[in-house]
From Swiss-Prot:
Keyword presence, Lyase: yes
PANTHER family: IMIDAZOLE GLYCEROL PHOSPHATE SYNTHASE SUBUNIT HISH
Subcellular location per the Swiss-Prot or TrEMBL entry: Cytoplasm
Predominant location category: cytoplasm
Name of the protein: Imidazole glycerol phosphate synthase subunit HisH
NCBIfam families: IMP_synth_hisH
Gene3D superfamilies: 3.40.50.880
Domain Glutamine amidotransferase type-1: 3-217
Organism: Methylococcus capsulatus (strain ATCC 33009 / NCIMB 11132 / Bath)
Involved pathway(s): Amino-acid biosynthesis; L-histidine biosynthesis; L-histidine from 5-phospho-alpha-D-ribose 1-diphosphate: step 5/9
Active-site residue list: 82, 193, 195
Catalytic activity: 5-[(5-phospho-1-deoxy-D-ribulos-1-ylimino)methylamino]-1-(5-phospho-beta-D-ribosyl)imidazole-4-carboxamide + L-glutamine = D-erythro-1-(imidazol-4-yl)glycerol 3-phosphate + 5-amino-1-(5-phospho-beta-D-ribosyl)imidazole-4-carboxamide + L-glutamate + H(+); L-glutamine + H2O = L-glutamate + NH4(+)
Record InterPro entries: Class_I_gatase-like, GATASE, Imidazole-glycPsynth_HisH
Length: 217
């Protein structure tokens, strides 16, 4: 039985993610926790989050979880979701500049005002709703069994901009391309919400629960 720690640092609907993980694999032992010992003893770690980056980093610091997250990402299969993906980069331009965890080189940027769609219609910020995802590396194990150009559910005003294109595992468009997923080593992270993305999201979570990055990549 695989043990999965969902990191609780005071931000995000963690129980919906835990429920989706349990639905993806009924045999997984899923725990929502802020206990460093439990996190580091788990087989897999999920790092979710919604809200402001400044609050995210402050909450991690208050709970002394910054180094725990870094260590978990280096040692075991690690899934970042939404703000949890953005926090892996070096800096966010939110709130005039906020230092992030620095596990992936690059910055987090805000969608500019005045965006328009293909027909000239104004696009709202935040980017909210279903959008198509283009796999940069369709062979990655977390995309297994998910059709190309699948739709996933997004809610965000900021997006990750990795410096190295090799770190980008998927893109989406609003209206220009942005990183919808990143991958490096044992880390895979997504901007969308798999727990809200129906069959494709549940399949991604199931793939994560089976992923063995030490043997597959």
């Amino acid at each position: 039985m695989s043990s999965v720690a969902v990191i609780d640092y005071g931000m995000g609907n963690l129980h919906s993610i835990a429920k989706a993980l349990q639905h993806a694999d009924a045999n997984a032992a899923v725990t929502v926790t802020s206990d460093p010992d439990v996190i580091l003893a788990s087989d897999r770690v999920v790092f979710p989050g919604v809200g402001a980056m400044r609050d995210c980093m402050a909450h991690l610091a208050e709970r002394r979880l910054e180094q725990v997250v870094r260590r978990a990402a280096a040692e075991k299969p690690f899934l970042g979701i939404c703000l949890g993906m953005q926090a892996l980069l070096e800096e966010s331009e939110e709130n005039g500049g906020t230092r992030c965890l620095g596990l992936i080189t690059g910055r987090v940027l805000r969608f500019p005002e005045g965006l328009t769609g293909a027909a000239g219609e104004p696009l709202k910020i935040p980017h909210m709703g279903w959008n198509r995802v283009h796999f940069s590396d369709p062979s990655h194990p977390l995309w297994a069994g998910i059709p190309a150009e699948s739709w996933f559910y997004f809610v965000h005003s900021y997006y990750a901009a990795p410096a190295d294109p090799a770190d980008v595992a998927a893109t989406s468009d609003y209206p220009t391309p942005f990183a919808a997923a990143v991958a490096r080593g044992k880390v895979f992270a997504v901007q969308f919400h798999p727990e809200k993305s129906q069959a494709a999201g549940l399949r991604l979570l199931a793939n994560f629960l089976r992923w063995e990055p030490w043997s597959s990549r």
